[in-house]
Structure formats: structure tokens, C-alpha cells
């Protein structure tokens, strides 16, 4: 039996986490030749490789190394570098998830008439200033099959004119992800490692460009962290994206001792 040749594209750590069990199932299938591609749009060891290691996911088959100096340059590099790979591999199907720049790989796939499957389709925030809103709309409308997490997402796509036979509600793969890794989560010693008491700490993740690169928003974020620390006197663990760390270092930010900036 001829195997279906499927390319899956990832580029960010949330995609890697959410697709971890899907990719494992695709790898295990006797009916599928699964090819995993990493765009390399922010290929930093702490942000990506550690997730492949910790989640037990194999190394990608191909890296696009598409990182650019700007978001626009990165998108351009992704489109330019995926196309010759598609020409070489000649896949039967193409899978992307979500709304980051990596999902725009679907554009060259569409031009080559490769069937596109889009997971996490139909999500909308209705804020055109958000770059991901543009990405998700583009990919939703060029995909052959949109896999939604909810009835609401499905309804959004129907209202935008997509035919019902191109939309399948699957639910979120995070259910399988959490169930699979639950023993590891329960066995984790992270609380003792960080000297934290259960239920008496805060976890913060804030790395979006509009929050970090905007001086007023960034200063407001730091002020909020200090106020929360002062009010509750609990440790605040901040998962610190490189963009956030660069801003902290460049501004020589001062925070209360309860605030800890840790690697993601």
C-alpha cells in the first residue's frame, strides 16, 4: 500500500506542545509517511529544542532557517524556503496549526494544489491590529479542510462563506497532551526546585510585541508585577521570552525580590 506523504510544519513552542501527540500518532501510522518541518523562525534552544527533548518528540526532518530581522522578512523567508522543499518532496497533504507566521507555509502549498489541513481553524479575536488575525483568516480560506476546536469557531467559518463540507470540529488536542504527560507533571519537582509552596505563587507569561515593545505597556506590566508582589508577598515566576529579557536588560528594570525572571 502506498503511504500518504504528509508534511507537518511547526515554528513556535505552542505549536510544538499542541501538536506533540498528533505528531506522535502520525509517526506511528503505517499508512502515513510523516515529514516534520521546522521553520526556524525563532529557533532558540530554550524556546524550541528543549520542548522536543522534554516531550520526547523526534528531531524535525528539515529546518527552513527562516528567521528574519523583522516579522515581514521572516514571512518572506518562510514562503521562499518552503516552496523548493515542496517541489522536492511532492507531498500528498500538508498540515499546519494555528495562526503564527509558520502557518503561512500553506500559501505555497495552495499554489501547488497540495491539500491543506488547518488545525485550530476558525478562531477569531475581531481585532485587525493583531497579526495572527490576518494569518488565521488567510489560512482558513485557502485550506481544503478546516479542523475547529469548537462549535463557535465552526460557526464563524460558515458565516464567512466557507462550505460546511470543508469544516470538521475535532476539539482541542490539548486533552490528549495533558493526559499523556500527566504522570510527568505529577512527578515534577519544580516547586521544590524553585522553593515554592503549592497555591502560594503566581506564574506570568507576557511576551507579545504590543505589550513588550510599547514603552507605556511595558512599564505598566512591570509596575503591575511590583504591586502584586507588594500586596500578596508571594513569589512571581515570570516566564521570560528573549524579547522580554532584552527589554528588561536594556531598561535596567528594577523589581521587588519576589519577582523572578526565569527562562521559558
Named regions from a protein language model:
Residues 41, 49, 186-264:
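Donor-nucleotide binding loops and adjacent catalytic segments primarily
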Residues 1-41:
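N-terminal subdomain of nucleotide-sugar transferases
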Residues 42-58:
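N-terminal beta-loop-helix "entrance" segment that forms/cooperates
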Residues 7-10, 16-25, 51, 63-163:
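Active-site and donor-binding regions of nucleotide-sugar-utilizing enzymes
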Residues 11-12, 39-41, 121, 172, ...:
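Cofactor-binding loop segments of dinucleotide-utilizing enzymes, especially the Rossmann-like FAD-
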Residues 42-46, 65, 142-217:
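A nucleotide-sugar donor-handling region in carbohydrate enzymes
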Residues 8, 36-38, 96, 118, ...:
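Structural beta-sheet core signal
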Amino acid at each position: 500500500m502506498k503511504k500518504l506523504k504528509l508534511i507537518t510544519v511547526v515554528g513556535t513552542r505552542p505549536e510544538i506542545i499542541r501538536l506533540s501527540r498528533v505528531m506522535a500518532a502520525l509517526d506511528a501510522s503505517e499508512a502515513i509517511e510523516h515529514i516534520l518541518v521546522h521553520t526556524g523562525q525563532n529557533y532558540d534552544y530554550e524556546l524550541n529544542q528543549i520542548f522536543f527533548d522534554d516531550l520526547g518528540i523526534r528531531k524535525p526532518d528539515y529546518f527552513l532557517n527562516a528567521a528574519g530581522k523583522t516579522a515581514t522578512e521572516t514571512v518572506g523567508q518562510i514562503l521562499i524556503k518552503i516552496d523548493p522543499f515542496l517541489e522536492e518532496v511532492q507531498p500528498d497533504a500538508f498540515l499546519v496549526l494555528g495562526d503564527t507566521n509558520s502557518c503561512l507555509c500553506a500559501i505555497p502549498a495552495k499554489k501547488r494544489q497540495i491539500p491543506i489541513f488547518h488545525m485550530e481553524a476558525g478562531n477569531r479575536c475581531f481585532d485587525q491590529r493583531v497579526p495572527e488575525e490576518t494569518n488565521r483568516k488567510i489560512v482558513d480560506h485557502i485550506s481544503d479542510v478546516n479542523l475547529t476546536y469548537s462549535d463557535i469557531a465552526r460557526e464563524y467559518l460558515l458565516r464567512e462563506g466557507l462550505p460546511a463540507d470543508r469544516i470538521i470540529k475535532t476539539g482541542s488536542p490539548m486533552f490528549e497532551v495533558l493526559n499523556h504527560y500527566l504522570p510527568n507533571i505529577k512527578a515534577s519537582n519544580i516547586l521544590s526546585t524553585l522553593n515554592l509552596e503549592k497555591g502560594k505563587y503566581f506564574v506570568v507569561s507576557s511576551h507579545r510585541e504590543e505589550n513588550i515593545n510599547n514603552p507605556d505597556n511595558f512599564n505598566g506590566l512591570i509596575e503591575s508585577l511590583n504591586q502584586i508582589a507588594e500586596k500578596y508577598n508571594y513569589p512571581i515566576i515570570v516566564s521570560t521570552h528573549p524579547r522580554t529579557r532584552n527589554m528588561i536588560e536594556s531598561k535596567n528594570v528594577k523589581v521587588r525580590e519576589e519577582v523572578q525572571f526565569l527562562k521559558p
